[in-house]
Design a protein with these regions (language model features):
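Residue-level signal for short segments within beta-strands and strand-turn junctions
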Residues: 17-19, 60, 84
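Basic/polar N-terminal segments that are highly enriched at the extreme N-terminus
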Residues: 1-13
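Cytochrome P450 core scaffold surrounding the K-helix E-X-X-R motif
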Residues: 54-60
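Glycine-rich beta-strand-centered segment in the early N-terminal region that forms part
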Residues: 33-50, 63-107
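Short beta-strand or tight-loop elements
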Residues: 11, 25-30, 42, 80
Length: 111
């Protein structure tokens, strides 16, 4: 399998942002600062993201969102797959270029 190319220097990314509660019309594509991997963390360049019923439920129900710790403005989506593009200090299980999948509370729909 061909190893994906990795750009570890990205400072900006695009992300779907939830800025108020409601239906799909409240979602906006925004250019945002790319997070940096801290100690013990990795950063993933998302190549695919899925939306499940809980994602949609939290966009329209402030009480549920609050129970899950969601604060506005927020990212959107919990399921993702992508490529590790940055590795923080102390991380030994992953390396830049590794293909990964997982879940992240309301931050999956981004690049």
């Amino acid at each position: 399998m061909q190893q994906p190319s990795v750009d570890t220097s990205a400072t900006m990314s695009r992300a779907v942002r939830l800025e108020s509660f409601g239906g799909p019309e409240v979602l906006n594509l925004r250019e945002v600062p790319a997070p940096q991997a801290g100690s013990g963390q990795i950063r993933v360049r998302v190549t695919a993201a899925g939306l499940n019923p809980m994602d949609w439920f939290m966009t329209s129900d402030a009480d549920t969102a609050t129970r899950f710790g969601l604060r506005l403005p927020s990212g959107f989506g919990t399921d993702y797959a992508g490529v590790v593009d940055q590795v923080g200090d102390g991380v030994t299980e992953f390396a830049a270029g590794d293909r990964v999948f997982g879940g992240a509370l309301s931050r999956a729909v981004a690049d």
